[in-house]
Amino acid sequence: MCDANDDADGGELVGPTPKIPVPDHVAEAIRTLIRWTGDDPDREGLLDTPLRVARAWKEYTQGYAEDPAHHLDRVFEEVGGYDEIVLLRDIPFQSHCEHHMAPIVGKAHIAYLPKDHVVGISKLARVLHGYARRLQVQERLTAEVADCIWNGLRPRGVAVVIEATHGCMTSRGVRTPGVTMTTSRMMGVFRDDERSRKEVLSLIGRG
């Protein structure tokens, strides 16, 4: 179900990013990193890079500034008796791994089986992004999203499946591109009832 606060782009806020102030010690840390790589932070092309990088990372990790559970505060009880699976497939997201701070790029499938109320569809994506925009590991991200929906909506079941590629594997270390990692968390009937589990996995496209 959509609500009046759902944005046309599926829940993402659109607009220019404000130029937040960057503390001197943060900018200097990035200058130090540039020097360590072998480049000169004082050359023309890199003069503004420390500020850009600092602001970019503040944006990449803006999930720390919010409680994703708040997106589930508003629910709808008048749903015409609907009591079947609600599923959002292929929600794109970006995160960064906590080990190398390398990009994690993927998509999530989020489903729940409502008990007596539903939530606006963009709110599921907002929960995902609230946790993804932090330093993460995919396993924890999957669990956090599922647990948040389970605790916030008290549905009969929750299923979260995440598929992602990891920069720490594709561009460093074993340098193996094209590898996708899949994680899942099933709760309630999707964990305990084989028929319900098969149904939701089939809808996701993994049955």
Ranges and model annotations:
Residues 1-207:
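A domain-level signal for the structural core that forms small-molecule/cofactor-binding pockets
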